[in-house]
């Protein structure tokens, strides 16, 4: 779990997301509170519950991006799910408990990577011995092995082809679920693991070069040095105490008054989410997982439905409300120029691979922002995603002819932008279909 201060978290998010100060502060405080809780005494720690967050705002303003960046910062198990993918128990589809199972799987991957890094030196040493075994055999004299070891470390044998045994990864029987019994693949997986251990584990022979064999063998040797049961225990504890679940599109399962359609299933999903958000125990193949201290961040555009259309019980379990505002022309301008991997920087880098130097004037950036705002207000407000559409239209000709213009420079100014999208943006009816 990272120990960044709220100010540091907001500063890091500022590198990728423009504006939305309230949302950044809310997630920064929530993340810091996870760390604060870990510092408490055992009896008080169990009493401190996370304050779940509901982010409300139009599409394309940064709700999902904030969650993605937060996940990288947190260094904790994190899953992002769309609420619309789940159905009420009894309906065909995934049930909400799968969220927790996915969270534990993410936790296992994180803990395994961390433990692998700790034993990497020893694993590399063991991998080197296995490469030498493949090159000179296990019965070779120490002098021969030392001679080949020197060549190996001097990269003289990198291209030599060898045959090595590596552990079989994945379940050969394949995982499956019995309809109506989520998690029913648990028994199947455990049986295959038990038989695998009883038979000493499955291996397969592969032919590869000495250079390429190292990555496979180091992973293989790392896994031999790790205690799987310990990893599973740590992953479950990490998911329970540090886990973050981002529930996107929650407005799509809100039931509107007087609405018709799949209302029962929508309301059913909300009712299934209640115990998960409040705190329950979910059975996974790694053991029971308590959801009491998992942080839930829900988000939705709420164009049609309102937050008050959610079940009152679910509203009560999302106590922190944050509203994200629509983007202005100045925001679009900053998105194009100030973010860490801005669109302008991306397009410049892409065209540089063809030897084309791309340059944008200040008035071109203003024109791009203006067109994006105009289209969002006249057609449909899709937020910052509109910039991608506009940029693609503007640079269509340059991108297509780039291979023939190697070594040339292209300057995009306001007139160039207006020629390529200005007329189209002005014609609202045409814009609806093209932009």
Swiss-Prot record:
Disulfide bonds: none annotated. One of its GO terms (cellular component) is HslUV protease complex. InterPro entries: AAA+_ATPase (IPR003593), ATP-dep_Clp_protease_ClpX (IPR050052), ATPase_AAA_core (IPR003959), Clp_ATPase_C (IPR019489), HslU (IPR004491), P-loop_NTPase (IPR027417). It is found in: Cytoplasm. It holds the Pfam family ClpB_D2-small. It comes from the Bacteria. SMART domains: AAA (SM00382), ClpB_D2-small (SM01086). Transmembrane segments: none annotated. CDD domains: RecA-like_HslU (cd19498). Keywords: ATP-binding, Chaperone, Cytoplasm, Nucleotide-binding, Stress response. GO terms for molecular function: ATP binding; ATP hydrolysis activity; peptidase activity; proteasome-activating activity. Its main location: cytoplasm. One of its GO terms (biological process) is proteolysis involved in protein catabolic process. SUPFAM superfamilies: P-loop containing nucleoside triphosphate hydrolases. ATP binds at residues 18, 60-65, 248, 313, 385. A double ring-shaped homohexamer of HslV is capped on each side by a ring-shaped HslU homohexamer. The assembly of the HslU/HslV complex is dependent on binding of ATP. Belongs to the ClpX chaperone family. HslU subfamily. ATPase subunit of a proteasome-like degradation complex; this subunit has chaperone activity. The binding of ATP and its subsequent hydrolysis by HslU are essential for unfolding of protein substrates subsequently hydrolyzed by HslV. HslU recognizes the N-terminal part of its protein substrates and unfolds these before they are guided to HslV for hydrolysis. This is ATP-dependent protease ATPase subunit HslU. It comes from Sinorhizobium medicae (strain WSM419) (Ensifer medicae).
């Amino acid at each position: 779990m990272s120990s960044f201060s709220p100010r540091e978290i907001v500063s890091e998010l500022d590198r990728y997301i423009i504006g939305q100060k309230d949302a950044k502060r809310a997630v920064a405080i929530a993340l810091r509170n996870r760390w604060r809780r870990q510092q408490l005494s055992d009896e008080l720690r169990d009493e401190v519950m996370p304050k779940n967050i509901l982010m409300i705002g139009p599409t394309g303003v940064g709700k999902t991006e904030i969650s993605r960046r937060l996940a990288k910062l947190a260094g904790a198990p994190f899953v992002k799910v769309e609420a619309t993918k789940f159905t009420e128990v009894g309906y065909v589809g995934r049930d909400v408990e799968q969220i927790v199972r996915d969270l534990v799987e993410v936790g296992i991957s994180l803990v395994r990577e961390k433990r692998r890094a700790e034993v990497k030196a020893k694993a590399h040493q063991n991998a080197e011995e296995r490469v030498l075994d493949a090159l000179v055999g296990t019965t070779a004299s120490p002098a021969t092995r030392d001679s080949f070891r020197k060549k190996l470390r001097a990269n003289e044998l990198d291209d030599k082809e060898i045959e090595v045994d590596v552990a079989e990864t994945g379940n050969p029987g394949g995982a499956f679920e019995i309809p109506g019994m989520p998690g029913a693949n648990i028994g199947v997986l455990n049986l295959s693991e038990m038989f695998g251990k009883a038979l000493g584990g499955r291996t397969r022979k592969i032919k590869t070069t000495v250079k390429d064999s190292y990555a496979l063998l180091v992973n293989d040797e790392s896994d031999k040095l790790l205690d799987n049961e310990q990893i599973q225990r740590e992953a479950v504890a990490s998911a329970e105490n540090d886990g973050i679940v981002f529930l996107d599109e929650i407005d799509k399962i809100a039931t509107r008054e007087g609405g018709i359609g799949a209302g029962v299933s929508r309301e059913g999903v909300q009712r299934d989410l209640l115990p998960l958000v409040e705190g329950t125990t979910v059975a996974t193949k790694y053991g029971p997982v308590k959801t009491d201290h998992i942080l839930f961040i829900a988000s939705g555009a709420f164009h049609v439905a309102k937050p008050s259309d959610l079940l009152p019980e679910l509203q009560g379990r999302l106590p922190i409300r944050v509203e994200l505002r629509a983007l202005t022309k100045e925001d679009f301008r900053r998105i194009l120029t100030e973010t860490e991997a801005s669109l302008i920087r991306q397009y410049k880098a892409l065209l540089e691979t063809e030897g084309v130097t791309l340059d944008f004037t200040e008035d071109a950036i203003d024109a791009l922002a203006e067109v994006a705002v105009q289209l969002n207000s006249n057609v449909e407000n899709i937020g910052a995603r509109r910039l991608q559409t506009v940029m693609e239209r503007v640079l269509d000709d340059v991108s297509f002819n780039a291979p023939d213009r190697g070594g040339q420079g292209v300057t995009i100014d306001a007139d160039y932008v207006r020629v390529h999208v200005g007329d189209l943006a002005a014609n609202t009816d045409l814009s609806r279909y093209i932009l």
